Amino acid sequence: CEVFLLVIPLAAYPLREIFHIGKDRRRGQRGTALVCSAAGYLCGFLWSMLTPCSWLVHILFLSYVISIAALLLLNVGFGLRASGHACSTTAPAFLLTWKLHPLFAIPSVLLIAAVYRSSLKLSRHSLPQLLAGSAVSLLACVISIMVYGVR
């Protein structure tokens, strides 16, 4: 599970440096990260379908697959810049809080606030772009829950 959520997406950064992907470093990292994340999440989703996994793992991987498809559509197709970082933190934070314990809301909100603050401070995204990323994530999560049912 961790291979698909962490190792494959993080491989984007060394891959970009080894193969010099993109005209400039930051743009190459963003593109490579998007491709590696999509590959990792899709492989994770397929893995979750082929092996016995918990309901939460199924929801998480389907949410990520829907989210990455929506981000590709919005960011590449329509030229918007919905935040991938906001997207990748919001639904998991919601799921942890909802399914494990309400006290997970505290670190979840702090994590999301840290993502927002760093993106705003570094001028990577505007508040509407961050909110769009979070909205994509929550919508994908709701769709995933509808597919697998509430437990």
Question: Model-predicted segments: where are they?
Answer:
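Membrane-helix interface and helix-disruption motif detector
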Residues: T51-V57
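Membrane-embedded catalytic cores of phosphoryl/pyrophosphoryl-handling enzymes
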Residues: H58-R151
